[in-house]
């Protein structure tokens, strides 16, 4: 309520609720173009068009957009898989074009992709979680501790001696997340991590992500096309054609139903219901995004009648 009253960027809000104003990711006039051959020439296709995004420590941010909006390209800039064609992106204060600091960036910002099979490299779950730790020379005692803690955190400790390839899609994705958090990152960027999962797998992964943010203070950037996932975050950024068109708390963003539909996006089911009821003559708050809020609003109207 206070966030809505004072606005997402109010210093009051961040100090009052113990949220840091430390910037984890800062994109400044970020532009990026892919080059493709055409009749012997390289043709540039600008995918990011001078975007400005600042993500603070401890935030849980969803980035939405239709295919081709630039959201996944932005995600790949957050740990220097891609670097800007122009403009800057700073991660934990480091310019991602500084080749001498790539290791520091990737230690602090872990990435999880759509298909967990592409990130699983070992035949045993605990060995997979330990893989990156071995590569950076973590001592064996510390490695054992981190692997166990990471698996317990994502509720996969009992599967530590299993083959990852025999697990469900949701379980595999949680193993991938365990491998990331064993590195003790400040931020996790997830690029459509539930796109290939069934509803149960999606729910498990999203609950794990929420827990990492709420209990451990890990900054989370969730690239998704599921509106109901985005509605559970602190902040929603909407991209279209390489630009940022909306950036606010979920209830404020999703109240722009017609704009979102115009760029090919849906809204959460509850928001859609409220929108349709209002078209039929009811006067419900357009910022409603949860079932509880909707039920309470309808009860109030029924009592008045």
Where in this protein do the model-derived segments appear?
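Conserved ABC ATPase signature
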Residues: 163-167, 171
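The feature captures the beta-strand-to-loop junction immediately N-terminal to the Walker
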Residues: 64-66
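Helix-to-loop junction immediately C-terminal to a conserved catalytic motif
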Residues: 79
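Conserved ABC ATPase "signature" region
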Residues: 141-159
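Conserved ABC transporter NBD signature motif
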Residues: 87-97, 105
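Catalytic Walker B motif of ABC-type/P-loop ATPase nucleotide-binding domains
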Residues: 188-191
């Amino acid at each position: 309520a206070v966030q809505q009253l004072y606005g997402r960027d109010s210093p009051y809000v961040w100090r009052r609720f113990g949220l840091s104003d430390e910037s984890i990711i800062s994109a400044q006039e970020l532009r990026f173009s892919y080059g493709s051959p055409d009749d012997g020439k390289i043709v540039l296709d600008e995918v990011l068009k001078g975007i400005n995004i600042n993500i603070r420590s401890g935030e849980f941010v969803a980035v939405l957009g239709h295919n081709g909006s630039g959201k996944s390209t932005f995600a790949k800039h957050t740990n220097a898989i891609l670097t800007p064609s122009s403009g800057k992106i700073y991660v934990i204060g480091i310019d991602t074009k500084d080749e001498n600091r790539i290791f520091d960036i990737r230690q602090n910002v872990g990435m999880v992709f759509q298909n967990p099979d592409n990130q699983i490299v070992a035949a045993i779950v605990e060995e997979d979680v330990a893989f990156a730790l071995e590569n950076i020379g973590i001592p064996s005692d510390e490695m054992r501790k981190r692997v166990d803690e990471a698996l317990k955190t994502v509720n996969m400790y009992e599967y530590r001696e299993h083959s990852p390839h025999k697990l469900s899609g949701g379980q595999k994705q949680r193993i991938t997340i365990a491998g990331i958090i064993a590195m003790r990152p400040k931020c996790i960027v997830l690029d459509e991590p539930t796109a290939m999962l069934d509803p149960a797998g999606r729910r498990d992964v999203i609950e794990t992500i929420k827990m990492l943010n709420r209990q451990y203070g890990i900054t989370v950037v969730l690239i998704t096309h599921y509106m109901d996932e985005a509605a559970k975050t602190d902040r929603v950024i909407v991209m279209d054609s390489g630009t940022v068109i909306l950036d606010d708390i979920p209830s404020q963003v999703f109240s722009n139903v017609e704009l979102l539909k115009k760029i090919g996006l849906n809204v959460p089911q509850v928001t859609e219901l409220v929108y349709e009821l209002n078209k039929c003559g009811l006067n419900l708050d357009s910022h409603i995004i949860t079932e509880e809020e909707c039920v309470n609003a309808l009860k109030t109207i029924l009592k008045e009648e």
